[in-house]
C-alpha cells in the first residue's frame, strides 16, 4: 500500500515590488514647479527654499529654478533648495 506524506508549508516565496527611491534631479539641473527631486524613506534630505515635502517624505519643487544640494547646521543636515533663475 503506497503512501505519501503531505507536503509541508513554507514561509518563503514572497517579494515586494521595487520602490524606485533616490535622487531624481541632481544639483545644477533645472526644475519646474511640481517636479520630484528626491524620493526617500525618512528625511535623509531636508526641504530648503522653494522645496516642499510630501507625506511620504518625497521632496518636490514648489517653484521653477535650479536644484542645489547643501550641508548646513550643527548636525550636518543635507538640504535641497531650488534657486530661482
Curated annotation (Swiss-Prot):
The keyword Isomerase does not apply. Belongs to the bacterial ribosomal protein bL27 family. InterPro entries: Ribosomal_bL27 (IPR001684), Ribosomal_bL27_CS (IPR018261). One of its GO terms (cellular component) is cytosolic large ribosomal subunit. It comes from Acinetobacter baylyi (strain ATCC 33305 / BD413 / ADP1). Residues 1-20 are annotated as: Disordered. Keywords: Ribonucleoprotein, Ribosomal protein. It comes from the Bacteria. The keyword Oxidoreductase does not apply. GO terms for biological process: translation. Transmembrane segments: none annotated. GO terms for molecular function: structural constituent of ribosome. This is Large ribosomal subunit protein bL27. The lineage of its organism: Bacteria, Pseudomonadati, Pseudomonadota, Gammaproteobacteria, Moraxellales.
